[in-house]
Amino acid sequence: MSIREVNAVAITDAVEELCIRANTQLPPDVKQALDNAHAAEPWPLARQTLELLQQNLCVAAEKDLPICQDTGMACVFIELGQDVHINGNLDEAVNEGVRRGYEKAYLRKSITADPLQRVNTGDNTPAFLTVHLVPGDVCKITVAPKGAGSENMSRLTMLKPADGVQGVKDFVKETVKQAGANPCPPIVLGIGIGGSFDKCAALAKKALLRPLDQPNADPYYAALEKELLDAINATGFGPQGFGGATTCLGVCIEQLPTHVACLPVAVNVSCHVTRRASAEV
């Protein structure tokens, strides 16, 4: 079996481009969800608000400007084939790409070197890197910038198994209720169910990488996604909290096996600017 060589410089170049693209161009599925919401929204103020969000997207894409002033933490996901060898340091390559991308596009630097001493690193590094080993020789990079307004509204709980699916529904709806207008709705929810405390949180983040027009492959969870989406939109919070039928654009659930005595649930809240961009090197 042959090994494919990937130069670390190629990874740096890809990450640089993806940081810029993710911050200036919304993924087609999220943009389509916004367009669909605008077409279906019956409340005049909500419809007007959605129209302003659409206009903002167009200006950002046309002028290569950030969609939002919070250009986020650089969350980088790499699907790395087991038959790939990287010539160079992967972590350094990713961080250099983030550094260049945020500098080149004049994106806001939002990372502190220490969570309590609060000294800004000045270049939006370090990136938050997750590597998934997969079969083959693929090297797929996804950059998903994540802003603090929605991240701060995210929650995790350790339910009792007896709480069951109703406990999951209640926790998700309570999370949205507590968040209110803070995460700049219409929101997107990444939900992790199962695993361990740490794996569940990572699973919720991973769920945000799935296109909104691709429901869970398991019909049971696909139905739960739809049920939660309808319930959240029935709250009437609406775009930016001004009221309306569009509080949420999509719910994406990912699930894992778990301990017989556990039922972890994590909700990673994302704003209407759910950013991600991918490339293979």
Regions found by a protein language model. Give the residues of each.
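Non-transmembrane, aqueous-exposed alpha-helical and coiled segments at domain scale
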Residues: 1-281
